[in-house]
Every structure is written in structure tokens, then in C-alpha cells.
């Protein structure tokens, strides 16, 4: 029912009284608000300070992440302030908690610069996270409207084109990170790359913190790595690649390194999340213009994504990175050494791979999301995985993933090439069993043992790592599940 002119006038006069009034009364709380298709939606987990009403805390989050300050300002009247105010429109208690609330907040699309992750995040995760009225605050999910998505280029290459370039279909990509990640000379580094690729991997990669240190400058690494790639291609007849980490102190230096990688014939470059949103978008634009695959290492994300009550959920980073234009992003393994609840990981992968997301509360997906034809991002599973887990990896993660066995390749007792061969044989045996309709999850260990009868490197790997697991309960688990999930 619409308000009368008198009622609207009364509210307006009350709202613009001088001084400090509650955010909820300033217009940042509207339980009757009708969400528009063009609104940017955000879901925050709000933990109010003791004595602070959850509705007021949610309204404060809406206000401080949009147009509000601590007191009424008359200059609001010079703007379309009723339109530009973010509106908290629903507040729900978080299941199984006594002091946490889900705040649903809508933002008008005109509050954000087109095609700018930096501007979007300056509002959504800006000053509001230091606001005293909340004890803790976490951004759990967002819905990005199609009208805003269309201002971003999306992944530079995308999964489908990458498969065509690599000529790899019907199975996950196989890769490995060079180990040790720091300290090798350029020549030894190149040898590791060659052995891994010749043994059967599709990719080798730099790790997040190998840039241009005194023990090996970047140009030396690039030259030896590409020599290794070319020799491995000649030896195997397969398309291969090495992720060249072009992360550097300045954009000018990153451009120089990326251009050199291109001149050497590399099909892929790599950057780290820590370079920042603007730099990531800038390199994604460069990658698309230069027909390069862009790999993103999520270095630094757990400083703000791992804890359940403060920071932001990694699924939000997945959405921002798909908008920014990366082709790969590390997104968890479930069974490896890094944080990863099975349901949460599935939600991350779906966010990166699906063209349309439905609400799925067990996976932590709170909003329907149409991806507006933005290309798919290939998830990367890396960190503490080995060939003995191949049936679990294929079951949890599916085909569209890069499985990276760093220590699980280079730590093989018979050498790097043997480690790579063990992983390739294990993967192909498991994919074949799946394609034949076998219950490859239940039969997985036996499938691997059978494959190892004709592959000595696989048998050695299974003997070495058969008992290695990382069974820790995840800190970030779903709020809407019947039973707890374990990292097994």
C-alpha cells in the first residue's frame, strides 16, 4: 500500500532533522523494499556489538557502505538520496548461533562505476568493516545484475577455448608446481619443468612467491622454462605449457615480463591475487588482447576469507575474479592440505563454471545469478594432493579442473618424470573406469592397484603416499546442512 503525501512528508522531515539519528530511521532499513533486477545485492553476516539491535546494525552496514556518515547532512537533499541509499531489506538469525545475523542489502546500480572491481569493492568492503557498531562483519555472497556484468569483459580465454588450444578433452588438466619454489637456479628450474612435462603433465607452473630474486632472475627462468616446454612438446607430440609468473612491483614491470613471455611463445602467464583488483583487471585485458591464458594464484586470500565471522567468503572472490577476467583460479581440493569443506568447495566450483546459479544454501549460495555469457573460469586444485586420491578428486571436482600435483610429482622417489607418469596413468585409469560406468569412487583403490601392475612409477607412488591424508575439520562450513561435513 502506497504512503500518503502527508506520511511521506512526515518521514522526510524526521529523516532530515539535524543531529544523529538511528540508521534505520534514516532510510537504510526498509522491510517493504522490492528488489529490482538491476540492484546489486549483498549478504553480510553481522555480529552486532552487545546491546546493538541487529536491524540497526544491518542498517548501519547499508548506510556506511553507501551514502551515510555519522550524522545527518543537509547536502543529501542535493542528490537523489532516496534512490542512492542502500537498503537493508531482510535480517535473519544465522542458524545455530545466538549473536549472528544475515543482513540482505540492496544497492542501486548507479552507485558503482562500470567495469571497475576497485570501485565496487571500495563500497562493499570499504570503511564499513571497521565500523564500531558491529563486533564482526563478513561478506557471504553477492548477486551481480546482468546490466552490471555486461560492463566487464570476463575471462580472457575461458575453459572451452583453453581446451581447444591445449587439445585436451574429457578429463581434468594435469599440472604441478615447481618445488622447491625458491632457491633453484634457472637451469635446474628448467630441468624440473622438462621432466614433469615429458612425464605426462600438461602444465608446470611457477609458485606464488617466485618473481625475480637474486638466486634466479625472471628472464633466466622464462628462457629455461620455455626451452623445457619446447623440448617436451617435441618429445611427446602434445601441447604443453608453463605458467610464467609475471607478478612484479609495478605495472610497467609486469607488462615487460608478460611481453617477453609472449615473445618466447608461451601460451599462459600467471599473476598473484596480492597485486590488487585494478592490476588483475589490467592484466586480464592485456591477456585477451594478446591471446594468452591468465592464471591467478589466490595468494593472500585466507587472511580474510578463512574465518567464519569476519572478512569475506571465497565465493565472493570467485565472482569478482570471473568478472575481472582471469582464466584460472585456485579454488580448493577438499582432500588436500589447505582449508576446504566439500560443500563450500562445490559452491566455489559452481560459481566459476556454471552459466546460471540457483540458490543453494548448503553450498552457501544465497542468490540466483545469471552470468550473462561471461566465460567460464577453470578451477585449480592444488596443495597436498597425490595420485592415491585420484578417485576422490574426480568425484569431488569433476572434469573441468586443473589438478596440480607439486610435491606429488617432484617428491617421487624415482624422479620427477616418474612422478608425472604416475599421475597421468592414475588419472587416465580413473577416467576410463568412470566412462565404462564403473563405481570408480568405491572401486578407486582397486582401480589404482590394477593400473599399477603395469606402471612401476604408480606402484611406487601408491606405496609411498598411501597413508597420507589431511583430515582436519574446516573452519568455514555451511550454515544450512543437516549434518556436519568433514574434510575426508
From Swiss-Prot:
The record marks 337 as: Transition state stabilizer. Substrate binds at residues 127, 177, 181, 298, 330, 382. Keywords: Calvin cycle, Carbon dioxide fixation, Chloroplast, Lyase, Magnesium, Metal-binding, Monooxygenase, Oxidoreductase, Photorespiration, Photosynthesis, Plastid. Mg(2+) binds at residues 205, 207-208. Binds 1 Mg(2+) ion per subunit. Disulfide bonds: none annotated. It is found in: Plastid, Chloroplast. Its EC number is 4.1.1.39. RuBisCO catalyzes two reactions: the carboxylation of D-ribulose 1,5-bisphosphate, the primary event in carbon dioxide fixation, as well as the oxidative fragmentation of the pentose substrate in the photorespiration process. Both reactions occur simultaneously and in competition at the same active site. NCBIfam families: PRK04208.1. The basic functional RuBisCO is composed of a large chain homodimer in a 'head-to-tail' conformation. In form I RuBisCO this homodimer is arranged in a barrel-like tetramer with the small subunits forming a tetrameric 'cap' on each end of the 'barrel'. Belongs to the RuBisCO large chain family. Type I subfamily. This is Ribulose bisphosphate carboxylase large chain.
Amino acid at each position: 500500500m502506497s504512503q500518503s503525501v502527508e506520511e511521506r512528508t512526515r518521514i522526510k522531515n524526521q529523516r532530515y532533522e539535524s543531529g544523529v539519528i538511528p540508521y534505520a530511521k534514516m532510510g537504510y532499513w526498509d522491510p517493504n523494499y522490492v528488489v529490482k533486477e538491476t540492484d546489486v545485492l549483498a549478504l553480510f553476516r553481522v555480529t552486532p556489538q552487545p546491546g546493538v539491535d541487529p536491524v540497526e546494525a544491518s542498517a548501519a552496514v547499508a548506510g556506511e557502505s553507501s551514502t551515510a556518515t555519522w550524522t545527518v547532512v543537509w547536502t543529501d537533499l542535493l542528490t537523489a538520496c532516496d534512490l542512492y541509499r542502500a537498503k537493508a531489506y531482510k535480517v535473519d538469525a544465522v542458524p545455530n548461533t545466538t549473536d549472528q545475523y544475515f543482513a540482505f542489502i540492496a544497492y542501486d546500480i548507479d552507485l558503482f562505476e562500470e567495469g571497475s572491481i576497485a570501485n565496487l569493492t571500495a563500497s562493499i568492503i570499504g570503511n564499513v568493516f571497521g565500523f564500531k557498531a558491529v563486533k564482526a562483519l563478513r561478506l557471504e555472497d553477492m548477486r551481480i545484475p546482468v546490466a552490471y556484468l555486461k560492463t566487464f569483459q570476463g575471462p580472457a580465454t575461458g575453459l572451452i577455448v583453453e581446451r581447444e588450444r591445449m587439445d585436451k578433452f574429457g578429463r581434468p588438466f594435469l599440472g604441478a608446481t615447481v618445488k622447491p619454489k625458491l632457491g633453484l637456479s634457472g637451469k635446474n628450474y628448467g630441468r624440473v619443468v622438462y621432466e614433469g612435462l615429458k612425464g605426462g603433465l600438461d602444465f608446470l607452473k611457477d609458485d606464488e612467491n617466485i618473481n625475480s630474486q637474486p638466486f634466479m632472475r625472471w628472464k633466466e627462468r622464462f628462457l629455461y622454462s620455455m626451452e623445457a616446454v619446447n623440448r617436451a612438446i617435441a618429445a611427446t607430440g602434445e601441447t604443453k605449457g608453463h605458467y610464467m609468473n609475471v607478478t612484479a612491483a609495478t605495472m610497467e614491470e609486469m607488462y615487460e615480463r608478460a611481453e617477453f613471455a609472449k615473445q618466447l611463445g608461451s601460451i599462459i602467464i600467471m599473476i598473484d591475487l596480492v597485486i590488487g583488483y585494478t592490476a588483475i583487471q589490467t592484466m586480464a585485458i592485456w591477456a585477451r588482447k594478446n591471446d594468452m591464458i591468465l592464471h591467478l594464484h589466490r595468494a593472500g586470500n585466507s587472511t580474510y576469507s578463512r574465518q567464519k565471522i569476519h572478512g569475506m567468503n571465497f565465493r565472493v572472490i570467485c565472482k569478482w575474479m570471473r568478472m575481472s577476467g582471469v582464466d584460472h583460479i585456485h579454488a580448493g581440493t577438499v582432500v588436500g592440505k589447505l582449508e576446504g569443506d566439500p560443500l563450500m568447495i562445490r559452491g566455489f566450483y559452481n560459481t566459476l563454471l556454471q552459466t546460471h546459479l540457483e540458490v543453494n544454501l548448503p553450498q552457501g549460495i544465497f542468490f540466483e545469478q545469471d552470468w550473462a555469457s561471461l566465460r567460464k573460469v577453470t578451477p585449480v586444485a592444488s596443495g597436498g594432493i597425490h595420485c592415491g586420491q585420484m578417485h576422490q578428486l574426480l568425484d569431488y571436482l569433476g572434469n573441468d579442473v586443473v589438478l596440480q600435483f607439486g610435491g606429488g610429482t617432484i617428491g617421487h622417489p624415482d624422479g620427477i618424470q616418474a612422478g608425472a607418469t604416475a599421475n597421468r596413468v592414475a588419472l587416465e585409469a580413473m577416467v576410463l573406469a568412470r566412462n565404462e560406468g564403473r563405481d570408480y569412487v568405491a572401486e578407486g583403490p582397486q582401480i589404482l592397484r590394477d593400473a599399477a601392475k603395469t606402471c612401476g612409477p604408480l606402484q611406487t607412488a601408491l606405496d609411498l603416499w598411501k597413508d597420507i591424508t589431511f583430515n582436519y575439520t574446516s573452519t568455514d562450513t555451511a550454515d544450512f546442512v543437516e549434518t556436519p561435513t568433514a574434510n575426508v
